[in-house]
UniProtKB/Swiss-Prot annotation:
Residues 1-15 form the signal peptide. Residues 132-478, 493-1101 form the Transferrin-like domain. Keywords: Glycoprotein, Ion transport, Iron, Iron transport, Metal-binding, Repeat, Secreted, Signal, Storage protein, Transport. Synthesized in the intestines of the females and males and also in ovaries and testis. It comes from Strongylocentrotus purpuratus (Purple sea urchin). GO terms for cellular component: extracellular region; signal recognition particle receptor complex. Glycans are attached at residues 198, 227, 304, 310, 402, 499, 530, 541, 572, 578, 625, 639, 692, 732, 741, 1035, 1043, 1081, 1128, 1208, 1241, 1258. Belongs to the transferrin family. GO terms for biological process: iron ion transport; protein targeting to ER. This is Major yolk protein. Pfam families: Transferrin (PF00405). SUPFAM superfamilies: Periplasmic binding protein-like II (SSF53850). It is found in: Secreted.
């Protein structure tokens, strides 16, 4: 979609064959000779685009406006469209370069129009040879301009005669942009604006102001410069004497943004010049480099948000005048700062120097610092360039450099005339361009000074000079500013905090860090937000860089805001010295084991397993700690032990006999107070995500909760900004786009490569210029269908715009029904006011098929849904990545879909991950119904807690108290030392745990004794709970991450440590160290670990009422994240696959193809039934990456638990086979069957020990893997097949009489994808293997069976 928009803009900015308005037939010829270029007529451009009708001189009626090197546009005769390519049509490489340049210019145009809006359409007149439009940027300037243009227009001496007009912008930069685009013609600039006008906006200087009189003659080497800056010091000081000795000195400056003062001469000009000459080393941008060069300064205003946008500039820039910036601002303030001894040097211009020299009483008190020595104040310093620290360009007049040569010459002539007629007149009698005193503009509220100063022109100026095009204008200024403009700021690290105490601590850390050599290589800053969600959003939006997040915040930050962990914040009571804080455990009373009689018969020392967890009552420590509720409950939800039906609370309440989760009473606890549980309702933001609509409306209203809270708006670096494109549409700047021929073959061929969107050309290939009667009828039918299916309204909405959203939808639908007679494209344009995207699709709608129109409708509606408009309007790729849209695009635009998906993506996995996407309409509750159900289950869950009010069950110790009191059987806990001490003193056993290498009996849980040192917790746990981490945006570079990590590690061992850790600090009192995280784990999925990750993914899944989940005999799958590791686990990829769950019954099946059928009870398990091979993106620990296909499961069914089940057919059991005399006896060499295989004579029918394919006499089903297959007579090509992944010592026998339902391990893919689980050995079915003395190998068991059979045969004989 973004590419379609970009293509249209690019197509309109090129000279392509077209018969539309603004473009003449033919193509641009190759660049002509230099002489032709000089003599040719220049042509202007409008809206940043070239227009042929600018070539309107006599004889140029068919000329085209063509652009060549150095951005020069001239009128040239075109090459006819029907001329063969060999005659001179541009070669493909030239076309590629031209389109690429057009793309860059279009992006620059869109960026600027967002910063500097275009004038309204009434004032957006096109450039003509007879009109000159002067642009000003204030009301006072406009007053003077109106009088000025009146004089110019009606004066008979202002020849050549022109019509002069004024146009007012809001800033000088906006004026520059308007002139660049042809919406204005001329303006004056001063100081730093002179550089911006020429470099940023491509304007051309034609004249400059100056002051020449007897007292101030023009100095040739300084004629282009308004001011020359000098470094002034007190003559009492020995140092500094040279520029290099300015290092580590204190400096005073007039300021950086104060009005009515010559600021560039005081700061920017000298600093940039000293950087250019190598005096000031480059350590960041020019302000940062200067602050590192000097010791302390007084630069009034430098920390204001106008300049200090990131809030990271060092406080040392205002240390000398922190509380008195206004007092020391301006030239007088800077001199006062110097004279008072606060600073050792200040920077002033030549006018100040001359004023000091004119006073003999103070002249000897100062000296100027030059490159090699300090000098007294004398006239020689003005011509001695070694004493010039900086230069300020004179006020300069700029015009569009793409004006025609004639218009440029006319304007220069008129500037000379303007000076002659109005430059030296009596200001009291006649109009004078340099006089501003006659205009009443009020006074400045800050200073009380009148505002009618230096309007348009400087009052001190008295003449104007035309710039000589053959010479460099203001070269010293451009040289210095070019250096500064290319400087890269220090890596920024703004820490986001959520309370005032942490914010003040962050400010203290910033002040300390700016004085530590290695740490100050980073620009530190602080951001105060209202909540952790706002901090995540700030980091995502690049207004902050770091945020300390606990494990649940880390998960939400990564999943919703694309943030990555950078460093872990080590807690001082962590169980390890790495990133692990604690481990999630569960404990059960020994007396509760009596509920499971089967455990009593297990011999001492043998493992005990609990299968039916639903028989238990549980106690939780509450929702404040991840290990207390989210980790264990989430993991049981993820592996299917607890069926997810409705909300998490409802699922838990349905499953266990009783539950105590303290402090979740519905009267006091809200869903949005918990980051994981609150995602269900978008953290309290109003939403209609569960409202009962019908059909497509239901789908669209249910999708917000199935997608990210924020967007991937920074995912595609080359994407165009939709908001700015909308601005173009609003200002009618895009009408020319649809006058281009979208089906131009050359442009279509370039689309995929140049725009970077493979498949976008599919949208425009084969587009027809007309629609036949059938097509029109089809469009009318489509229009009627969509008008009844879609409620349309304005696409751009804000958070406050959702209260009456349903009513607006109904009203919009009625409007659609009333507009049936309108063309479909017009209806869309009327409905979606302001959307350029709709314009593009309307054009395509008229030319292509209903597939595009359907996609356009879906996209438009998704963009109107809450939380898809508030934050996701920035890039259209966001909408394309929406699951509902992706599923449609994958069918109809498969190539286009591959552009906007991650390397690993699958429709089926996506549907299971966003399960409301497939939830039936009749099972989708309304919001209030859902909330009522949640509250009912909250009430029931807290009954167990509230019925024992005298006992406090809050926290981990409260949960253990709950167990001891007999209220519950089992509780969640943690391996933290303070909790484990309580465990050792309590009559409890650890249980409900997950082994490090799971036995094949999960979701049973092994019960083990609590050892003295709690070492069992290292392997028996629900997963490790990680320490909090500093998260940052996903698209920060590797160098940035290392610079920040290194700086924080150095700060940890410096005087900054007390500001980082302790009471009232940035990290807090419970933490003591920052640990770097390896790049391979700098994503939230691998850092959190598989068990906690799946636990949280299960908690945040959208609620669905899938009735089948708690029914036996049903198998289904849930999508979760998995980590694929390769190359000795040094490379990993993050993928999605399916976890198979369910409780299938035993299945009775008949086996055998011939002979009597046998009926066998077969154990069924939920297993993957469908696999796909998708590309995965592997990242390695050394920064290397590669793409490689991996196989993953996408669907589940009830299947055999084992890959192979062996059985013996009925006819092999006949007694006949016990007598070898039953063989067919050959009658001699002449027997006709001698050369024919006789199956009844095969020896293994009579002696089964001769072939391992038979295991007779075993009436149970043997479930095992066959390691070796042996044939009696090996044939060529048949080899022994060995499976090295199988453990030959594992043997399992299933008793069909006692086993009624599955208890197998969750299918994670260990067997079917060995490369993902290296070192894993398949372990058979779900029943506990025989161990110890009773364990028998398969060979031993087989021999025993055969011995019994042989005994029967001998007895028969």
């Amino acid at each position: 979609m973004r590419a379609a928009i970009l293509f249209c803009l690019v197509a309109s900015s090129m000279a392509v064959p077209s018969g539309s308005l603004g473009s003449r037939p033919g193509t641009c010829p190759p660049q002509p000779s230099d002489q032709v270029m000089i003599e040719a007529t220049r042509c202007s451009y409008v809206y940043g685009l070239t227009w042929d009708w600018n070539c309107n001189s006599q004889g140029q009626e068919n000329y085209k406006c063509c652009q060549y090197e150095n951005d020069i546009r001239i009128c040239v005769p075109p090459i006819p469209a029907d001329v063969d390519e060999e005659v001179g049509v541009e070669q493909p490489s030239q076309s590629v370069d031209q389109v690429r340049q057009a793309i860059q210019k279009t992006q620059d145009f869109i960026r600027k129009v967002g910063l500097y809006p275009a004038p309204d359409q009434r004032r957006r007149t096109t450039p003509t040879p007879d009109t000159v439009r002067w642009c000003v940027s204030s009301r006072c300037q406009m007053t003077k301009c109106q009088r000025m243009v009146s004089e110019f227009t009606y004066s008979p001496n202002m020849v050549p005669r022109k019509q002069w007009k004024c146009t007012q912008a809001t800033s000088q930069e906006q004026c520059m942009f308007w002139i660049e685009q042809g919406w204005a013609d001329i303006m004056t600039t001063r100081e730093g604006q002179v550089y911006s006008a020429n470099t940023t906006f491509n304007l051309k200087p034609i004249a400059y102001e100056t002051t020449i009189n007897d007292q101030q003659p023009e100095i040739q080497i300084l004629k282009h410069y308004q001011n020359v800056t000098f470094a002034l010091k007190s003559s009492r000081l020995v140092n500094p004497n040279t520029f290099s000795e300015l290092r580590d000195k204190t400096t005073c400056h007039a300021g950086i943004d104060m009005p009515d003062f010559d600021m560039p001469a005081s700061f920017a000009d000298p600093v940039c010049n000293l950087i250019k000459e190598g005096v000031i080393p480059v350590t960041g941008n020019y302000i940062e480099s200067f602050s590192d060069f000097v010791q302390e300064s007084c630069v009034p205003g430098v920390l204001n948000m106008t300049y200090n946008k990131n809030g990271t500039y060092p406080l040392s820039l205002v240390t000398l005048c922190e509380d008195q910036q206004y007092k020391y601002s301006g030239i007088k303030g800077a001199l006062s700062c110097l004279e008072s001894g606060k600073g050792q040097v200040t920077f002033v211009d030549q006018k100040v120097i001359k004023k000091i020299m004119s006073d003999p009483n103070v002249r000897d008190n100062f000296q100027v610092v030059c490159r090699d020595e300090s000098r007294p104040l004398d006239e020689e310093i003005f011509t001695d360039v070694t004493c010039h620290v900086g230069h300020t360009a004179r006020p300069t007049i700029f015009i569009n450099k793409n004006n025609t040569q004639q218009k440029e010459t006319d304007i220069k002539t008129l500037v000379v005339k303007m000076m002659e007629l109005y430059g030296n007149t009596d200001r009291d009698v006649n109009f004078n361009i340099f006089d501003s005193s006659v205009y009443d503009c009020g006074k400045c509220q800050m200073t009380g000074k009148p505002l009618n100063k230096n309007l348009i022109f400087l009052e001190e100026s008295n003449t104007m000079k035309i710039v000589d095009d053959s010479k460099v204008y203001a070269g010293e200024v451009y040289a210095a500013y070019n250096v500064c403009s290319k400087l890269v700021p220090k890596p920024r690290a703004k820490i986001c905090v959520t309370n005032v105490t942490e914010y003040e601590a962050c400010r203290r850390f910033k002040g300390i860090a700016e004085n530590i050599p290695e740490v100050k290589k980073v620009a530190w800053g602080c951001v105060l937000a209202n909540s952790s969600i706002e901090c995540m959003q700030a980091v995502h939006n690049n207004t902050a860089d770091l945020f300390k997040a606990n494990p649940m915040e880390t998960f939400i930050a990564g999943k919703e805001f694309l943030l990555d962990p950078l460093m872990s914040v080590h807690r001082n009571d962590s169980v390890t010295m790495n990133h692990t804080y604690t481990r999630t455990l569960a404990v059960i009373k020994r007396s509760s084991l009596a509920k499971f009689p089967g455990l009593l018969s297990v011999p001492e020392g043998q493992p005990k397993y609990i299968k039916d967890l639903w028989k238990l009552k549980i106690c939780s420590a509450g929702l404040k700690n991840f290990s207390a509720f989210h980790s264990p409950i989430g993991y049981l939800l993820a592996n299917g032990t607890i069926p997810r039906i409705g909300s998490v609370f409802e699922s838990v309440n349905r499953y266990f006999q009783a539950t105590c989760v303290p402090e979740i009473e519905p009267e006091t606890w809200r869903l949005d107070s918990d980051l994981l549980l609150g995602r269900e309702m978008n953290w309290g933001f109003s939403s209609l995500n569960m409202y009962n609509f019908t059909g497509q409306e239901w789908l669209l209203w249910n999708t917000p909760a199935t997608w990210n809270f924020l967007t991937y708006n920074r995912k595609v670096s080359t994407g165009l900004d939709i908001k700015k494109l909308i601005e173009l549409k609003k200002q009618n700047l895009t009408s020319h786009i649809f006058n281009q021929n979208l089906s131009s073959p050359r442009n279509v061929e370039l689309l995929d490569d140049l725009v970077g969107v493979e498949g976008i050309s599919d949208l425009v290939k084969g587009v027809q210029d007309t629609i036949g009667p059938e097509g029109k009828q089809k469009m009318n039918m489509l229009r009627d269908r969509l008008s009844n299916s879609f409620p349309n309204f304005e696409a751009v909405r804000t958070l406050s715009d959702k209260v009456d959203i349903v009513n607006k939808m109904k009203d919009a639908r009625q409007q659609r029904l009333q507009n049936k007679d309108h063309p479909f494209g017009n209806v869309i344009q009327e409905t979606f006011q302001g959307h350029l995207m709709v314009d593009v699709f309307s054009k395509l709608l008229e030319l292509r098929s209903d597939k595009i129109s359907t996609l356009e409708e879906i996209i438009s509606h998704v963009k109107t849904i809450p939380y898809l408009t508030d934050f996701k309007d920035v890039e259209i790729t966001t909408v394309l990545k929406h699951p509902a849209i992706m599923s449609y695009v994958e069918i109809y635009f498969p190539r286009l879909s591959q552009t906007f998906v991650e390397p690993f993506d699958n429709v089926e996995l996506r549907e299971r991950e966003f399960n409301r996407y497939t939830n039936p309409l009749w099972l989708s509750p309304k919001v209030h119904t859902y909330l009522d159900l949640v509250k009912n289950h909250q009430t029931e869950i807290t009954k167990t807690c509230n019925s024992n009010l005298p006992l406090n069950f809050k926290g981990y110790e409260g949960a253990l108290r709950c167990l001891k009191s007999g209220v519950a059987d089992l509780a969640s806990s943690t391996s933290r030392p303070s909790v484990t001490r309580t465990l050792r003193d309590t009559d409890l056993s650890t249980g409900w745990v997950h082994l490090q290498r799971p036995p094949p009996s999960l979701p049973q849980r092994q019960v083990v004794e609590i050892d003295v040192n709690m070492d069992i917790a290292k392997v028996c746990n629900f997963g490790e709970v990680m320490n909090p981490v500093l998260v940052t945006a996903y698209n920060t570079s590797g160098s940035w991450r290392w610079n920040i990590t290194k700086a924080l590690m150095i700060a940890h061992q410096s005087v900054a440590l007390p500001a980082l850790f302790g009471e009232g600090t940035v990290m807090g009192k419970d933490y003591d160290m920052l640990l770097p995280i390896a790049p391979l784990n700098q994503s939230y999925q691998p850092f959190l670990g598989s068990k906690p990750l799946r636990s949280m993914e299960a908690i945040v899944k959208a609620s669905s009422y899938d009735w089948f989940k708690d029914q036996t005999g049903i198998c289904y799958g849930e999508t979760y994240t998995n980590i694929v590791k390769q190359r000795n686990e040094t490379c990993q990829a993050i993928v999605k696959d399916v976890t198979c769950v369910g409780t299938p019954r035993m299945k009775k099946i008949s086996v055998g193809r011939f002979g009597a059928k046998q009926f066998k009870m077969i154990k069924m398990c939920s297993r993957p039934s469908k696999f796909v091979r998708k590309m995965a993106d592997f990242q390695c620990d050394n920064g290397f990456g590669y793409l490689k296909p991996v196989i993953t499961a996408v669907a589940c069914e009830c299947m055999l638990c084992e890959e192979m089940i062996e059985y013996n057919t009925s006819f092999t059991e006949d007694n006949m086979w016990s007598d070898v005399s039953n063989k067919y006896v050959l009658t001699g060499e002449q027997d006709i069957y001698r050369q024919i295989p006789i199956w009844g004579n095969n020896s293994y029918f009579y002696d089964h020990t001769l072939n391992k394919n038979f295991e007779l006499g075993n009436h149970s089903i043997i479930v095992e893997h066959v390691q070796t297959v042996v044939v009696e007579r090996p044939s060529p090509g048949i080899l022994s097949q060995v499976n090295s992944e199988v453990d030959p010592e594992v043997q399992v026998q299933m008793d069909s009489a006692s086993l009624t339902k599955t208890c197998e391990t969750v299918w994670n893919g260990q067997s079917w994808l060995p490369e993902r689980f290296q070192g894993y050995k398949t372990s058979g079915s779900c029943v506990v293997p025989e161990t110890g003395a009773n364990a028998k190998s398969r060979v031993d068991r087989f021999r025993q069976i055969m011995q019994r059979k042989q005994q029967l045969v001998d007895h028969h004989h």
